[in-house]
Amino acid sequence: MAATIFLTMIVLLLLGFPMMIPLIAGAFIGFLMLFGDLARTETMVQQMLAGIRPASLIAVPMFIFAADIMTRGQSAGRLINVVMAYVGHIRGGLAISTAAACTMFGAVSGSTQATVVAIGSPLRPRMLKAGYKDSFVLALIVNASDIAFLIPPSIGMIIYGVVSSTSIAELFIAGIGPGLLILVLFSAYAYIYAVRNDVPTEPRASWAERARTMRQALWPMGFPVIIIGGIYGGVFSPTEAAAACVLYALVLEVLVFRSMSLADVYDTAKSTGLITAIVFILVGAGAAFSWVISFAQVPQQILGAIGIAEMGPIGVLFVISIAFFIGCMFVDPIVVILVLVPVFAPVVKSVGLDPVLVGTIITLQVAIGSATPPFGCDIFTAIAVFKRPYAEVVRGTPPFILMLLGVSVALIFFPQIALFLRDLAFSK
């Protein structure tokens, strides 16, 4: 049964069908093999509706909407300016500023695609003019934008939290440590690259200029305070923090900065609605698929066949990491989370792994796979945004992928990288 379900999904994917079709088809075929007729198909529909019922999913469209508003407005530009003013003058400062700006914008958007557009579009021309090779610039933007998938408000963590019934607030806090570690590694590599390639430094900003850019960026810097401070302080749930971010973004861009009209807001809302519809269809289809394979005990069959339960916690984490990394090299990250999390859930529970640690590792692997050839989705986002050939986008990625894989291995052996802040925030 498992072979039939997954073979059907693979064939449909290879034929080019949208991601939701293989999920629904796999669930439907599994349903027919279980019950033998169509008399109880309403059960599968009920499972799809149940999958999109959790209130925490409301945070997804809200964070997407807030990110789109900031991308079209001035918030992203103000964050870029303040980072450039403080670190742009050091060796590799422009590249370090790009990585830092991606991290800062990721901390208010949770979207890798929005980060590529908002940060990559204005900074790539400046980096090329400064003497950086385009292959390095593209790889830096793609991989630094993936930090947005790890640090709060990560949309990937929201989906994982819903599918696995794990605290989204704890996942958000756990992603901060690995995200900052990645930023440090990318910054160190940017410095080494600039030294080896004799990239000239940018002019040092005056203290008056730094103060001016800081004042301009104070309003956009309120987003992380709302998200992290609000959740940590017990003021907001993640869903409430998302709603507060939307309201804050609208007030900033429409009333304070006056960078968007009501017509712009309407266009942004339409775009968000389209993306949200796709995400929710995927989540609903994934819920039906998860119910079918769980009912048929497919996860137990697969995991029993490879003997994963005898590997111990470290071995299980390595298998999970490899599965999600490879999966996201070929398939959309949300689909990989929806399909594989239910498969590994029984063994995660049986070996006593912390679901927050597992979620952090999974989210990191999803981010790495999304930026890895041959079909990582972030690669094609960069191709579409910057109009550059595939070979040029992927040429500079190996050093970044190796650093990200190094962080994932460190997380497995030193879980406190992720769990220290979680334990501190939630007194565990």
Swiss-Prot record:
Main location, first listed in the record: membrane
Cell compartment(s), UniProt: Cell inner membrane
Pfam families (UniProt xref): DctM (PF06808)
Family matches, as InterPro entries: DctM, TRAP_DctM
Transmembrane segments: 9-29, 49-69, 99-119, 139-159, 172-192, 217-237, 242-262, 273-293, 302-322, 324-344, 366-386, 400-420
Keywords: Cell inner membrane, Cell membrane, Membrane, Transmembrane, Transmembrane helix
GO (cellular component) term, any one: plasma membrane
Keyword Transmembrane: yes
GO molecular-function term, one example from the UniProt record: transmembrane transporter activity
Membrane topology value: Multi-pass membrane protein
Function, as annotated: Part of the tripartite ATP-independent periplasmic (TRAP) transport system UehABC, which imports both ectoine and 5-hydroxyectoine as nutrients, and not as osmoprotectants.
Note: Transport is enhanced in cells that are grown in the presence of ectoine, but not by high-salinity media.
Family as reported in the entry's similarity comment: Belongs to the TRAP transporter large permease family.
SUBUNIT field: The complex comprises the extracytoplasmic solute receptor protein UehA, and the two transmembrane proteins UehB and UehC.
Protein name: Ectoine/5-hydroxyectoine TRAP transporter large permease protein UehC
